[in-house]
Every structure is written in structure tokens, then in C-alpha cells.
Amino acid sequence: MPLYVIDKPLTLHILTQLRDKNTDQINFRKNLVRLGRILGYEIANTLDYEIVEVETPLGARTKGIDITDLNNIVIINILRAAVPLVEGLLKAFPKARQGVIGASRVEVDGKEVPKDMDVYIYYKKIPNIRAKVDNVIIADPMIATASTMLKVLEEVVRANPKRIYIVSIISSEYGANKILSKYPFIYLFTVTIDPELNNKGYILPGLGDAGDRAFG
């Protein structure tokens, strides 16, 4: 199961600031950008590369690495909380093509939210995904019930990309298992796995509503 939990001291330091209810909007966004960049570098470790030889300014020749897949990246932004996260990913993958998906869960006021809640896609603009060539990165800071992500994955899997990556900051144990049991070939990168969901489908302990905290 390709689950990558990037729980290193720096990522956990940034995560702690994101969880803190006293972190203001500006610093919340900045920290999402920082984690996006770090997680992008972690993804780069799994991409295809070639051994190449170059000549230095001193006339010496030496071997190095050319990550060929850097030219074959598509990043999909799940609005709106993923915007700062994608900004960070683009620092790692400046040549990436970008797509945007707007999705919303169907809620009934005053009622508990089922874990298999309905989700509808209200906006979609995705560049052409080249089958077995492109590496698609789907960004969403929070994977709770995974209902939104599974809806987006229906769109992406049909295109048959080379690899599919999911980038999140916090994933619930329930959501991560649900995604990887249905799509065991997907690479899920997250900073931490949180154990619980409340009756509204939010992750506990979590960090609140990432979109509201980033943009108001």
C-alpha cells in the first residue's frame, strides 16, 4: 500500500502551527505553502530519472541525475483550501500543468453527515492527461471521509495516467483506508493520520476548516 506519512520534525513543526487555533490567516496560508513545497520534494523522489553526464566549468565530466518526469506533471487543485498547497507544489514542479476542480458535499442542516456523503462537482477544468505518460498530483489539505477525493479520482483514473499522487496535510484513518482499498496503486502523501471523524465528517483532532482558516 503506497502510503507515505512524512512525519519529520520540520513537517510536524509546521503542522503544529496549522493546528493551533491562534495561528492567523496569513501564517496559516504560508504554512500550507511550505508543506506543499516539502511534499513536492518527497514526491520527486519517486519519479523516473536517467543517469546523465555533464561537463563542469572546470572542464571535468561527472555523472548526475535528470528527473525526466519533471516534464510530465499535472497538478489538480481541489478548490478552495488547496490553493496555497498547490502554490508550494509549483515551487517543486515549476513546469507542471494545472487543473482545477470545484466539489462540494451535499449537506442536510441539523443532521449528521454520513461517511459516504454525496459530493457533486460544480466546476472542472483539467488539461489533457496523457495516458501512461503524465503523473497527476491531486491536492487537498484534508482527507476526511474521502468522498470528495473519490469523486475526483473517478475523473482522473479514466484518463489512465502513469501515476496518481494525492497530497494532503492531514488524512483520517478512515479516508486513507477507503481510498487505498479502492485504488491500491495510488500514492498517498500526507503529514499525519488522524484517528477520528466527528458527526459532521470533520477530522479530529484536525485543524478546523482549512478553507475558512486560509481565506476567511
UniProtKB/Swiss-Prot annotation:
Judged by the first EC level, this protein's enzyme class is transferase
Asked if the record carries the keyword Magnesium, the reply is yes
Q: Which InterPro entries match?
A: PRibTrfase_dom (IPR000836), PRTase-like (IPR029057), Upp_A (IPR034331), Ura_phspho_trans (IPR005765)
Return the EC number.
2.4.2.9
Lineage top rank: taxon: Archaea
Pathway named in the protein's UniProt entry? Pyrimidine metabolism; UMP biosynthesis via salvage pathway; UMP from uracil: step 1/1
Q: Which residues bind 5-phospho-alpha-D-ribose 1-diphosphate?
A: R80, R105, D140, P141, M142, I143, A144, T145, A146, S147, T148, D209
Q: What positions does the entry give for uracil binding? A: I203, G208, D209, A210
- The coding gene here is upp
Q: SUPFAM superfamilies annotated for this entry?
A: PRTase-like
Instruction: Please give the family membership noted in the entry.
Output: Belongs to the UPRTase family.
- Tell me which UniProt keywords the record has, alphabetically: Allosteric enzyme, Glycosyltransferase, GTP-binding, Magnesium, Nucleotide-binding, Transferase
As for what it does, the entry says:
Catalyzes the conversion of uracil and 5-phospho-alpha-D-ribose 1-diphosphate (PRPP) to UMP and diphosphate.
> Which CDD domains does UniProt cross-reference here?
PRTases_typeI
**Activity regulation details:** Allosterically activated by GTP.
**Keyword Magnesium among UniProt keywords:** yes
Its source organism is Saccharolobus islandicus (strain L.S.2.15 / Lassen #1)
Q: Which GO terms describe its molecular function?
A: GTP binding; magnesium ion binding; uracil phosphoribosyltransferase activity
Please list the GO biological process terms of this entry. UMP salvage; uracil salvage
**Essential cofactor(s):** Mg(2+)
Residues recorded as binding GTP, renumbered to this chain, are K30, N31, L32, V33, R34
Q: What protein is this chain from?
A: Uracil phosphoribosyltransferase
The free-text cofactor remark is: Binds 1 Mg(2+) ion per subunit. The magnesium is bound as Mg-PRPP.
Catalyses which reaction? UMP + diphosphate = 5-phospho-alpha-D-ribose 1-diphosphate + uracil
